[in-house]
Structure formats: C-alpha cells, structure tokens
Regions:
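Elongated, amphipathic alpha-helical interaction scaffolds
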Residues: 1-259
Length: 259
C-alpha cells in the first residue's frame, strides 16, 4: 500500500518532486519500465520520471533491503542502454526510522566496479521542506520533528487551503496512509477530515483493502471492484493500475468488461 501511495504522489505531482530532489521545477513525465528491457523488471516500488535531459529513479522503502545497491546499478545500466546520453539521478527514500546499517549504504561495489546513488532518510529531513508543495505534504509527518501530531495539524491546515477538491482529497488520503506508519489511526482521524478523504480514489482503495484484510481472494475481488468504479468515472487505465496495484493487463480486461 505504501509503495502505491508514494508512486501515486510522485507521478501526480512530478514537478514538486523535481523541485525537492533535483533542485528545480523540471517538467517530468512517466517512463515505463517496459521501455528499458525486454526482460521482466520488478516495478512494484519503482518510479521512473523523465525529461529530455534527465531520468529520475525513485524508490520508497518502509524497510531496508540488502538488494537495493544491486538494483540501483541494474536500473542505471538499463537506462544507459536505452538512453546513453541522459543523466540519471537515483534516490532511495526510507520512510521509517531504523538503526539498520543498510539505510546508510549509498554504493554498489564489485571488484573494479563502483556505483553511487543517493539515500534520503525522511526522519532526518527538515519539516519545512515538505510544507511548501501539495505533493510533498503527506511526507511532512515522517520528517525530523519532535511533535508529529503538531506537524500533522500543520499539514491538515495546508491541505484545507488546496482549492481543487480532487487534489485536496487525494493529498488528505495519502497523508492518512503515510501518517499511519508512526501515529495511531485514532489520532490521525481526529485531525484529518474524514469527509474530505471519502471523496478520494485513494481512500476507496484503503477501505477495499481493509474490508478484505486477511483474505487474499477477497482482497483481489475488492480491488477489482474499486478499479471498475474508477474506470466508470473515466479514470485512465494507467492511473487505476498504480492506485490499486493491479497490472495494466488486469485493468484493461476490467475496462473491456465494463464496456
């Protein structure tokens, strides 16, 4: 769920992420992993955004994994093979505090080969960095703050200032999910307006997964129903796919069934 939400935010607010990670508001578009290789590529937590000059590779992780350094060089070489003249920035964002040494790793080394990538540990990042743009608001509560509840109130106030209803509801629902990594649901619900979140497509996914928790087949059916509802609302197949975690092919079949 956390992977899907972070991916949704990055692909919905690419300019906010470009400003944060690249230092300037570059216009970025989604780069499909299928463009990089004929071989299967693990894309569940992979985010690729591109401009004419640069490719931004993002991965959000709740837990450290030993294979991250290898994955970084693997994706770097795939992009080089496809776009040899483009620069590439690779950033791994860890969401939860941990004492594991793995979150300090920024290099893949093999004999005479050395590849570097960037790591951001959210709990070490200044909170104000995430309060200036809608797409970054959901991460503020995970940043370096001594008062997470107070920070969530700041985020809720900023969300209330978003004029577009759909953007407001999606940012609120994304904040609800990510805040759940470090705060109790009751505390979050006291601050974030449930009526705003209920209008969000991401909130629909939360409810579907919650109702089907512990039942794999039920979860799949619930997500398919959410996907059908979103398709009927006219949402694009690619957006439905990344929100629900269903594959493009699965959503295409549902779209055909929906007529």
């Amino acid at each position: 769920m956390f992977d899907n939400i972070c991916k949704f935010l990055a692909e919905t607010f690419p300019t906010d992420f470009a400003t944060w990670l690249l230092g300037e508001p570059i216009a970025l578009t989604e780069l499909s992993p299928s463009e990089l290789s004929l071989e299967p590529i693990r894309a569940d937590s992979l985010i690729l955004l591109q401009s004419e000059d640069v490719v931004l590779h993002l991965e959000f992780q709740t837990q450290p994994k030993r294979d991250i350094p290898f994955r970084m060089i693997d994706y770097r070489l795939r992009v080089y093979r496809r776009f040899p003249h483009r620069q590439m920035r690779q950033v791994v964002v860890y969401l939860q505090p941990t004492t594991s040494d793995l979150v300090q790793q920024t290099t893949f080394t093999l004999e005479n080969t050395c590849h570097n990538f960037e790591v951001i540990r959210l709990w070490e990042q200044p909170t104000p960095d995430f309060l200036q743009a809608p797409g970054l608001l959901p991460f503020a509560v995970l940043s370096e703050t001594d008062d997470r509840v107070g920070t969530l109130r700041q985020v809720a106030q900023a969300i209330s200032q978003i004029s577009d209803p759909r953007t407001q509801s999606n940012v609120a629902a994304s904040t609800f999910i990510l805040a759940g990594l470090i705060l109790e649901a009751e505390a979050i619900q006291q601050i974030l307006r449930r009526d705003v979140m209920q209008e969000s497509v991401t909130y629909q996914v939360i409810k579907a997964e919650g109702k089907a928790e512990g039942k794999a087949e039920g979860s799949q059916e619930a997500l398919q129903q959410v996907a059908m509802n979103l398709l009927r609302e006219g949402m694009e197949i690619s957006v439905v796919s990344r929100l629900t975690g269903l594959s493009i092919e699965q959503v295409q079949l549902l779209a055909q069934a929906a007529g």
